[in-house]
Each structure stands twice: as C-alpha cells, then as structure tokens.
Amino acid sequence: MTEYKLVVVGAGGVGKSALTIQLIQNHFVDEYDPTIEDSYRKQVVIDGETCLLDILDTAGQEEYSAMRDQYMRTGEGFLCVFAINNSKSFADINLYREQIKRVKDSDDVPMVLVGNKCDLPTRTVDTKQAHELAKSYGIPFIETSAKTRQGVEDAFYTLVREIRQYRMKKLNSSDDGTQGCLGLSCAVM
C-alpha cells in the first residue's frame, strides 16, 4: 500500500484541524483549540489505488514557527490553507510557500491552495484572486467547508494526485541517467 505524507499548513484559525478531522472522522469540530501538532492516518482508495494518508496537522500560531522546518522536511505534499473571510491568512500563504520551497530546496513541491470556510456568507478573499494566485504558483485551488464537508475529500485527494505526478516526474527524470549527477559524467571509484 502506498503511503503519502501530507502536511496541512496555514495561519491560526483558518480551519486546518477542522478540515483534517472532517476527512478522518466525518465530523465537524466547531470549538477552536489551537493545535501544536497532531498526526492522523487514514486508509482510502483514490483512483482505484489503496493509499495510506499520513496527515500532519500543524500549528498556525507564530510561536510554534520553529517547528515548521522539521515537518516541512518530512512532508511530501502540502495543503496551504487560508480562510475566505481572512485576508491576512491569504497573504500569509506566500510565506508558507516560500518556507516550504526553502526547506525542500526546490521550486517544485506538490501543493494545493485551499480556501476554507466557503460556507460563510461574507468573504474578504475573492475566488478570482485565489485562482490567480494558484495559477501563478502552478498549483490547483479548491474551496472547502469543513462545516458542510464541501471540497474536503477533493482537497486531500487532489494533493495525493499532485504527489503521484511529482513521483512519476522524478522517476522519469532519473531514467535519463542524470539524476544526482547534475548532467555531468559520474565515475565510481
């Protein structure tokens, strides 16, 4: 069974834990209890493949930012979550993305941009803005509601598909013999 290490990142209060718990337990948590770090595992079938999702739900609070490098190092794919009623959380996405790219030492990291709380009547982040940001990053954008479950599976499953594509790309690039050699000739001594 293939395992996928997913990491849910974003500012405090955007609904990272609510999204994760909705996926894992089919239940909406409406009280806010800031997360330090929680890990969940769930077996699912995505596109006919049985997968084990290893999901790390992270702290959004700034005081836990020192822990970020560690989980960013081990994660394979990232759900970058903002709340559609919180412009600051949307602006913060770029900070998370840049930190992920720095820690992974790569511009090509599987990610999905997630606009949560789409069940709310008022929004400060326009869908068009979010689509444009995702397009500029070259990643998918999905609106979700942890409360109604709208888009929850779609967000996590899309991330798994992004990781699959990334793995295939890495596999194909290593077939040309240049992997690890930076295109130079290698010799075993």
From Swiss-Prot:
Could you list the residue ranges that cross the membrane?
A: none
How would you describe the post-translational modification of this protein? Palmitoylated by the ZDHHC9-GOLGA7 complex. Depalmitoylated by ABHD17A, ABHD17B and ABHD17C. A continuous cycle of de- and re-palmitoylation regulates rapid exchange between plasma membrane and Golgi.
Which Gene Ontology cellular component annotation is one that this UniProt entry carries? Golgi membrane
Reaction(s) catalyzed by this protein?
A: GTP + H2O = GDP + phosphate + H(+)
> Which residues does the record give as GTP binding sites?
10-18, 29-30, 57-61, 116-119
Pfam families in the cross-refs = Ras
What keywords sit in the KW lines? Acetylation, Cell membrane, Golgi apparatus, GTP-binding, Hydrolase, Isopeptide bond, Lipoprotein, Membrane, Methylation, Nucleotide-binding, Palmitate, Phosphoprotein, Prenylation, Proto-oncogene, Ubl conjugation
The membrane topology noted for this protein in its Swiss-Prot or TrEMBL record is: Lipid-anchor
NCBIfam families given in the database record: small_GTP (TIGR00231)
Please identify the protein, giving its name as recorded.
GTPase NRas
Tell me the organism: Monodelphis domestica (Gray short-tailed opossum)
